[in-house]
């Protein structure tokens, strides 16, 4: 009768360890899927008034925050357009970005729009504000055509800060007229989020009265510290709601 020869336990452990190392070091090891975040918005998303928007804009800072905190499998794309609206009527508007989404296919979309909708003559955006809800809902529907499982965060616009340093009298008059519209849009966007089953992030309230975070002579666009703060608000929301995971 043939006897079954068993390998020594020590040899079995060595073989198991060798197999584990092979799996870890093998070029065929499956990597974590790269998830894509599209930051869609106007000049504040783009990083207006910054010296280096490619590294100082809120999407760029957000990317660094994710990486620093071990959220390593995320790729962020800045899709900010200066002066853009989500209103179809507006020129420019965010609708032209939809053509680029099929090539990126985002898993998460953060939309920050509304600032330019408050502009009246000569652009007449506010005169078409009754179209805002329908246009926003249609925009969300178009994103879902690209990825039905996309997690969408819609943000209210940043508050305008009339106490910002060195504002001209003309600028103060302009912002004083437009600022109540920002708060009206905050309510409208929150309602859209509920209707369309998206996430809602309030960016209006956190910037209320924060003159130290706004660009001098401007009052609408953040300064470098303001963009850092904006990125932290978005980061904290994504983490708290578990929209991003490790």
Model-derived features: positions:
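Conserved SGNH/GDSL esterase-like catalytic core that processes O-acyl groups on lipids
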Residues: 34-39, 44-134, 221
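Residue-level detector of flexible, active-site-proximal loop/helix-junction positions
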Residues: 28, 44, 83, 159, ...
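Local alpha-helix boundary/kink/capping signal
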Residues: 22-24, 65, 199
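Alpha-helical cap/lid subdomain in secreted, periplasmic
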Residues: 72, 95-246
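Sec-dependent signal peptide cleavage junction
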Residues: 29-35, 181, 246
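Hydrophobic alpha-helical membrane context
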Residues: 25, 54, 235-237
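Bacterial Sec-dependent N-terminal signal peptides
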Residues: 1-34
């Amino acid at each position: 009768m043939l006897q079954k020869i068993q390998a020594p336990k020590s040899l079995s452990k060595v073989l198991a360890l060798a197999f584990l190392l092979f799996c870890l070091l093998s070029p065929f090891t499956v990597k974590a899927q790269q998830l894509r975040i599209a930051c869609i918005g106007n000049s504040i998303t783009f990083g207006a008034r910054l010296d280096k928007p490619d590294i100082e804009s809120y999407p760029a800072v957000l990317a660094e925050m994710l990486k620093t905190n071990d959220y390593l499998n995320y790729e962020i794309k800045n899709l900010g357009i200066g002066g853009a609206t989500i209103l179809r009527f507006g020129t420019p508007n965010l609708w032209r970005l939809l053509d680029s989404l099929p090539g990126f296919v985002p898993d998460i979309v953060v939309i920050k729009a509304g600032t330019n909708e408050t502009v009246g003559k000569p652009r007449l955006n506010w005169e078409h504000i009754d179209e805002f809800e329908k246009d926003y809902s249609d925009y969300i529907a178009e994103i879902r055509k690209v990825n039905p499982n996309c997690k969408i965060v819609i943000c209210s616009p940043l508050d305008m800060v009339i106490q910002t340093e060195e504002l001209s009298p003309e600028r103060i008059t302009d912002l004083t007229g437009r600022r109540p519209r920002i708060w009206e849009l905050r309510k409208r966007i929150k309602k859209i989020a509920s209707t369309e089953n998206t996430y809602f992030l309030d960016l209006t309230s956190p910037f209320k009265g924060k003159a130290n975070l706004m660009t001098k002579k401007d009052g609408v666009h953040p300064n470098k510290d303001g963009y850092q703060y904006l990125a932290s608000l978005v980061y904290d929301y994504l983490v708290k709601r578990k929209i991003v995971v490790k």
